[in-house]
Regions:
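PRPP-associated nucleotide enzymes
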Residues: 1-122, 126, 130-188
Length: 188
């Protein structure tokens, strides 16, 4: 039986988001697998499936807003916001900049976050967790509570383990395993 998780992997391969070859990652590490998340999340079916999967994961968590570091989180947070609205359980979307704007409002975080809000951080890939931890720090600094961290892909190169060790509820949709296999998370 083909589960929604397995279908997401099939679509990621079909859109070219999952690639095999020789790649240099943002961390500088070399890899024989690469996930080009925007090819999945900017595809109409991919955006719907990712948004739907993350909404399922967030169900019952009390999350009020979802977002993360630009640019990877932009289509993910938008998809989740749209799907949540369609389900009648709207979640706000927000974006964290690499650094505050140098003009206008000079914001680090775009969106309607307020202190005390329960938020989920999303990203396309977690390798060592740098982007996710920047987003976590930014929202926690304004008084928000991170109750869930969701990535489309966990590369299993330390980031996911560090999130869990630091007390965050981390859920990937897809695992890139050390043996080279790609495995769906059956939780959604």
């Amino acid at each position: 039986m083909n589960t929604p998780a397995d279908s997401l992997i099939e679509l990621a391969k079909k859109t070219g988001a999952i690639k095999f070859g020789e790649f240099t990652l943002a961390s500088g590490a070399k890899s024989n697998r690469y996930f080009e998340g925007k090819l999945l999340t900017l595809h109409p079916e991919g955006a719907c499936r990712v948004g739907d999967a993350i909404c399922n994961i967030l169900e019952g968590s009390g999350v009020q807003a979802v977002g993360g570091l630009i640019i990877g989180a932009i289509p993910i947070a938008t998809a989740v916001a749209v799907i949540s609205q369609m389900r009648g359980k709207p979640l706000l979307a927000f974006l964290v900049r690499e650094s505050p704007k140098e003009h206008g409002t000079m914001k680090l975080i775009e969106g309607q976050l307020e202190p005390g809000m329960r938020v989920a951080i999303v990203d396309d890939v977690v390798t060592r967790g740098g982007s996710v931890f920047k987003a976590i720090e930014a929202v926690e600094n304004i008084g928000c509570k991170v109750v869930k961290v969701v990535a489309i892909v966990d590369r299993h190169e330390g980031g996911g383990d560090k999130l869990i060790a630091d007390g965050y509820d981390f859920v990937p949709l897809i695992h890139f395993n050390a043996d080279g296999t790609v495995q769906a998370n059956k939780l959604f």
